[in-house]
Every structure is written in C-alpha cells, then in structure tokens.
Regions:
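Active-site histidine-anchored catalytic micro-motif
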Residues: 91
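Beta-strand-loop-alpha "switch" segments that mediate conformational coupling across diverse proteins
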Residues: 65
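Conserved phosphate- and dinucleotide-binding cores of soluble alpha/beta proteins
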Residues: 1-59, 70-79, 84-87, 96-193
C-alpha cells in the first residue's frame, strides 16, 4: 500500500535533501536501566511465554519506550532458545526489531514509523522490512487493518488502574507527556500487554 494517500496531498515539492537522518533517533528508544523496570520486562516476557500468547508464528508490536524495548529483547532471546519465529512485527520499528528480522526470529516488519537509524537502514535495504501506511494499519474500517491480526502488543503507560485503564497522556503529576504512540490502534487489538 502507498505510504501517503493522494487525498492527503495538496502539492508535491522537489527538495535537494529529505530530512536529516541523524536526527531521527528518539530519546525514548533506549532500553531502561532501572532494575525494577528490567524485572517487569523479564516477568512480562515470561508471562507471554507461559500464557501461550508467545508462540511460533505469533505477531507482535513493540513500543519504543525503555521498558517495552527491554521486553522485546527478552522475547527475542526466548524465540532464539526455542527456535521460534514471529510471523511479522508491526512498528514503529527500532534496532531491536530489526535485529529479530536479520537474525531470523521475525519473518517481516510492517512499518509505519522508523524510530532509529538501524530501522531506517533496514527499510532501505531489507525486502522483508515493508513500509506500511498508518492510514491502513490503524483504520479499523480498512481491509489493510492490522490490529485484529496482532497477538502481542507491548506499549508503555505512566499509570494503569485496577480496571486496566491506561494513562499515556500525562505523568502522575498531571504534566503532559508526549505523543501517545500506538495506543489508539492497540485498543482495537486482541491482546495488549
């Protein structure tokens, strides 16, 4: 599918250079160093395995926050140990998802956003790393919608209450955070972690 649909284009402008690749890296795309969050990540990956949500051929979306990235690393190690392969990953992609693809633990990456330079390189070089429009991926009226095909969706939140309502808009002090990422499509999915 096209990355930008024609009905969203007013004009096309030719430029000498498109963007500054070295500024693509986001501050959120670093694995957490917090021992507590690393433990949460490890326990989450173990839960995915023990519950049967993680299996050979499963599909996964992993967020770009520090704990989400750590979960993806633990999942990658499990996949290698078991000889399993994810059917596809949906991104925002990072170097951790690219590593799964390049090492054979993921068949494809369907990518709506590249979060770091490894992901940018992979989209350019790897035929199994496929740009995928958010107009299709997140639109539950679209035949290209991915949310109902996802087995595992891992995203960060600042707060979760006892009824599993997630806050991704503010810190607990009420100050606005940043973009909400993939939450809007994940809420339509079968499994959200």
């Amino acid at each position: 599918p096209m990355e930008i649909e024609g009905n969203y284009v007013d004009c096309v402008v030719v430029v000498d250079k498109l963007g500054i690749p070295e500024k693509i890296v986001s501050g959120t795309t670093q694995i957490t160093r917090s021992p507590d969050r690393l433990l949460i990540a490890e326990l989450t990956a173990m839960f995915l395995e023990k519950s049967g949500l993680l299996y050979d051929g499963a599909t996964m979306q992993a967020g770009a926050g520090g704990t989400s990235l750590a979960i993806a690393v633990f999942v990658h190690e499990m996949l290698k140990k078991k000889g399993w392969k994810l059917s596809f990953g949906f991104g925002g992609s990072t170097k951790y998802m690219v590593k799964m693809l390049e090492e054979g633990q993921m068949g494809y990456i369907l990518d709506a956003q590249a979060f770091d330079l490894d992901a940018v390189r992979s989209v350019e070089e790897n035929p199994n790393h496929i740009p995928y429009s958010v107009f299709n991926a997140y639109n539950y009226h679209s035949k290209g919608n991915l949310t109902t095909m996802m087995d595992i969706m891992i995203l960060g939140a600042t707060e979760i209450d006892t009824e599993f309502n997630g806050n991704v808009v503010t810190h607990s002090d009420g100050l606005l955070l940043h973009g909400i990422g993939g939450w809007q499509n994940c809420l339509h999915a079968r499994n959200v972690i």
